[in-house]
Amino acid sequence: MRKIALLLFIASCIICKAQIPASGKVSQEKMLERFLSYVKIESQSIDEPSMTSFPMTDGQREIARYIYNEVKGLGGKGVKVNLSDDYYVYIDIPSNIKKKVPSVLFMAHMDVTPEAPGNGIKPMIHRNYDGGDIKLPGGITLSPNNPQCAHLKDLVGKTIVTSDGTTLLGADDKTGCAVLITLVEELIKNPKFKHGRVMVALSQNEDVGKAAMRYDPTVFGDKPDMVIDVDGSTFDQYSIANFTAIGQTYYFTGNKAHPSYGKKEQYADALTAASFFIGLVPPEMNPSAREGKEGYIHCYSLAHPLDESGKSNVNDYVVKVRLRYFDQQEGAYQKKLMEDCLQKVQTAFPFVEAQKTDDQMQYENIAYSMPDYVPDMVKKAARDAGMEMREKYARGGTTSAMMVARFPDVMPGGSDFYSGQNAEHSCYEWACVEELMVLVNATENIVTSVMTIKN
């Protein structure tokens, strides 16, 4: 099926390329101005332990209102812009052609990670980069010899944006926001650009794993035919698959007794039972032993549960476990293995009440629901814009993966596409303005390529 889609796609490339409008409608300086306006709004999200809470900072509200007003000011016939109560921004641009073609939903997020300092961001512009070290006032140096900054060696003569070294920059994912809003502007202001329906969703709390929690799957009405998640951090790769992520929680309920009379008094040693449980997981399944397309099992937390008042229950223990896998058969194996581990604990420690809560689907593999034509389309769209990209299996999750897990019936899997962010979640974070312009062209190519696919 994928081969047929590829042949149809290649056969239409000449037509597709001819329909792409000339670039340069939005200047590089305007792109820089847009990106700087976003990163100056401090929109760090808050990482609360509860998976049901959805905290919102003033900065998150501010950037959502800013982008909403920016897009509203662009006008556009039939263009709908919505700012939700949870400060998601939804943009719906209708098709301007008669032919029915697949719709495209682009995604990015407006919040910034809380994992690095994010107050008092002072972006710095380094024009005509000379290929050497970039020394920042905050005392850190961005060097092309550092793996985080190795891509700098490819960008001699370009314009690099950093923080002052005391905070992160916010390129994750305000590069994606800048690219997509520029795409929106070009679609609105250039009626000669023929396209199908294009939608954009900018989410909140992605960097704390909650982007899908308040997404409104009804806001666009119909299910999008394909999704592109503009939040990638590897300039020469795009994802075609990612881990399925399952969260498991195991409770071990104990009671104190004098250990000298432990059997008689039915001593429930929850600590030893929980430790025994963790030790039953084969070490070859630990993340430290896995790579490539191999999944893993990670018992990553052992702690006392909290009562309603927030006080620790010292007799009991909670073990939290991550299951990660690409292949559904491996996932079935992991779940069965953990069931067996639990049964062995129940047999070995009959006085301890050992039980598991319901599994929590954290994110799903995009490969299961991604249309066959998407990977080759993305690769060619990038190539035509001047970027060579290769497929990757992402050992993690994305906004699209979270959406697919929460809304499997209305959200297809979407490729995670490079947004221009580098050294994310750190004070070394940086972006290249010229790359953002190239990425706008790449997203334009995707929009145009869709018109060659039969819906």
Task: Describe these PLM feature segments.
Residues 152-243, 286-311, 319-326, 454-455:
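Acidic/histidine-rich catalytic neighborhood of metal-dependent amide-processing enzymes
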Residues 1-19:
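Bacterial Sec-dependent N-terminal signal peptides
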Residues 240, 262-305, 312, 329-354:
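Acidic-enriched catalytic cores of C-N bond-cleaving enzymes acting on peptides and small amides
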Residues 49-101, 105-107, 111, 122:
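A non-catalytic alpha/beta surface segment that caps or lines the substrate-entry region
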Residues 315, 389-446, 450:
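Zn-dependent metallopeptidase/amidohydrolase metal-coordination segment
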Residues 100-197, 202, 438:
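Active-site metal-coordination/substrate-binding segment of hydrolases
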Residues 26-58, 161-162, 361, 420-426:
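N-terminal capping segment at the start of a domain
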Residues 271-292, 296-300, 362-415:
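Active-site-adjacent substrate-binding region
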